[in-house]
Each structure stands twice: as C-alpha cells, then as structure tokens.
Amino acid sequence: MAQTDKPTCIPPELPKMLKEFAKAAIRAQPQDLIQWGADYFEALSRGETPPVREQSERVALCNWAELTPEVLKILHSQVAGRLIVHAEELAQMWKVVNLPADLFNSVMNVGRFTEEIEWLKFLALACSALGVTITKTLKIVCEVLSCDHNGGLPRIPFSTFQFLYTYIAEVDGEISASHVSRMLNYIEQEVIGPDGLITVNDFTQNPRVWLE
C-alpha cells in the first residue's frame, strides 16, 4: 500500500534560493515573469548563471517607462508624507507613471506587502531594482528622499537612514544584524553632526563605513 502521509522535506537552501530569485526578478523586470522564472531555475539546475536582461534590452522590448530616481521622486511626492499607502492606490500611481506591472508585483512579493503598505519599505525595494548593492540602493533612496533642495549633497535624517539600512539588510539576508548595528553605531557617534542628518558621502566616501 502506497504511503500518502510522508512528511514534505524542504531543502534548507530553498529560502535563500527564493530570496535571490525575487531580488533578481526585481532587477531584471521581465515582461513574462513566469517564462523568465522557468529559464532562471533551468539555468540553476544546469549550474549556469541565471539570465538577467540588460536594462537597455528591456526598454527596447517594451513600451513601459523606465524606472529612474526621478520617477520614484514623482511617486514620493504623490504619497505626500504618508507612512502608509493602500495597495490599490499605489498600484494606480504606478500605472499612471507607466511603470511595468510585473515590477510592481515583484516588489510586493519581495516585501510581502498586503493591503496597507509601509511606503518607505516599498520605496527601498523599488530602489534596489536600480541600486543592485545595498550602498547604491541607499544612495538612490537618499536622492529620492533628500531634504536639501538647494543643490547640496542629498541628505536625510539619520533615523530614516537607520530604518532603511536595517530593513534592506534584513531583506537581503546576507549581512549579519551585528554588522548592521556596528556600522550604525559608528555613523551615529563619529559621523552625524548636531543637525542629525546623514549625507550620501557619509556612507559612500568614508573608508570606515562598509555597509555590505
């Protein structure tokens, strides 16, 4: 008699594989996510590098607008300082600026967002499609959120940077919480001035700050 109640064995490496797939999907922004996913895992099974389409190729193949910091600034201005945005409203904003629906869905899936979305978290993951590395992602987020409108270096409150760095590192899964804590403590104690702001150069040009 065949057994039907055998326990399902989940490989320990599966969560990491799925996380890497989700991040790769955000960066590739494929038109057909299902086919792209099939090609991705087929390449992995053969021990090959998974497919990643170049941005120029993506633009040439579709009529969608290109995701840029400027487009994200438009979305941020429409959010108008709110911490929470409803998924339906954000999807409509995304559609109005003509960004790919698959990219929106990928960000939603990676962030495990539901009906009510924390805007800063969504923005951080959208920026990761452009930034590739954590440092570059945070640089783009700072440019989008910058409170300096006089042509100076992009800068944001350190508390906001702390929240974003902690969240992005958590989603990435490759950086220990202790490393994140050490970097934040160093920046807060040795870099941040009395205004409580952090500039892009504070974490991109300082040799003692290594966010990855």
From Swiss-Prot:
Residues 209-212 are annotated as: Interaction with RHPN1. Residues 12-49 form the RIIa domain. This is Ropporin-1. It comes from Macaca fascicularis. Homodimer. Interacts with AKAP3. May interact with SPA17. Interacts with RHPN1. Interacts with FSCB; the interaction increases upon spermatozoa capacitation conditions. Interacts with CFAP61. PANTHER family: ROPPORIN-1-LIKE PROTEIN, ROPPORIN-1B. Keywords: Cell projection, Cilium, Flagellum, Phosphoprotein, Ubl conjugation. The modification Phosphoserine is found at S56. Belongs to the ropporin family. Important for male fertility. With ROPN1L, involved in fibrous sheath integrity and sperm motility, plays a role in PKA-dependent signaling processes required for spermatozoa capacitation. Sumoylated, sumoylation decreases upon spermatozoa capacitation conditions. It is found in: Cell projection, Cilium, Flagellum. One of its GO terms (cellular component) is motile cilium. SUPFAM superfamilies: Dimerization-anchoring domain of cAMP-dependent PK regulatory subunit. CDD domains: DD_ROP (cd23019). 'Ropporin' comes from the Japanese word 'oppo' which means 'tail'. It comes from the Eukaryota. GO terms for biological process: cilium organization; flagellated sperm motility; protein localization to cilium; regulation of protein phosphorylation; sperm capacitation. InterPro entries: ROP_DD. One of its GO terms (molecular function) is protein heterodimerization activity. The RIIa domain mediates interaction with AKAP3.
